[in-house]
Amino acid sequence: MPRYKLTVEYDGTPYVGWQRQENGHAVQNAIELAFKKFCGEDLTLSAAGRTDAGVHATAQVVHVDLTKDWGAGKVRDAVNAHLVMADERVSILNVERTTDTFDARFSARARHYLYRIHNRRAPLAVDYQRAWWVQKRLDAEAMHEAAKRLLGEHDFTTFRATQCQAKSPVKTLDRLDVIRNGDYVEMRVSARSFLHNQVRSFAGSLMEVGVGRWTADDLQAALEAKDRKACGQVAPPYGLYLIGVDYAFPY
């Protein structure tokens, strides 16, 4: 069966997350239904990142096996047409044929996320549900310096959800940068894989540094505590974006 690699963009606001669930409409549901209307097949998609409810993506990666050998452009345009007709907030940006051994999840070498904080006194209008609104002025430089304490391999128990199903809390963090961009404070983070709620836990804890309630040493102590109770608040999902996934090429 021909395998296809899809790059997908979506607004996570109306969805219960990426993964198909019984309690609501998921991004996976939306795309699988569009494929069903296109080719008449009941398909199961596999994604690089199983984003939570409200989390957005500009470059989610998915693979799917089809019975017929369709042209990549035909797949993209036909599935997008059905997504538009269904009023879904999902777009297939690119489709390419790939090898049978490519797996969107398990072949990934790195995942890249962006967390956006809208940092001004006035509330959000255009970017409502697209960024976390924090009124108090944040010291982005202090946040960036503190974030260096989290780089490398650590036991990130403090920064993972209590219901996280990962076998080990140990992960290697390759990048964690914080910069100010006008009224926004942006956190960019990269690793091969992440724990459940890890990025949002970083954002909430670094916000504590930004407003002056925590120092870099406090963040270090939270990391070393290996205790979920030591974490700062978990930032809301709507500020988080999956912005890229890296693979070895050729697949």
Swiss-Prot record:
Signal peptide range: none
Keyword Isomerase: yes
UniProt GO MF annotations: RNA binding; tRNA pseudouridine(38-40) synthase activity
Residue sites binding substrate per the record: Y113
Catalytic activity entry: uridine(38/39/40) in tRNA = pseudouridine(38/39/40) in tRNA
Gene3D superfamilies in alphabetical order: Pseudouridine synthase I, catalytic domain, C-terminal subdomain, Pseudouridine synthase I, catalytic domain, N-terminal subdomain
Protein EC: 5.4.99.12
A biological-process GO annotation: tRNA pseudouridine synthesis
Xref: InterPro entries: PsdUridine_synth_cat_dom_sf, PsdUridine_synth_TruA, PsdUridine_synth_TruA_a/b_dom, PsdUridine_synth_TruA_C, TruA/RsuA/RluB/E/F_N
Active site (catalytic residues): D52
Alphabetical UniProt keywords: Isomerase, tRNA processing
Keyword tRNA processing: yes
One Pfam family recorded for the sequence: PseudoU_synth_1
Main function: Formation of pseudouridine at positions 38, 39 and 40 in the anticodon stem and loop of transfer RNAs.
Family classification: Belongs to the tRNA pseudouridine synthase TruA family.
Self-association state and partner proteins as the record states: Homodimer.
NCBIfam families per the UniProt record, alphabetical: hisT_truA
Record's protein name: tRNA pseudouridine synthase A
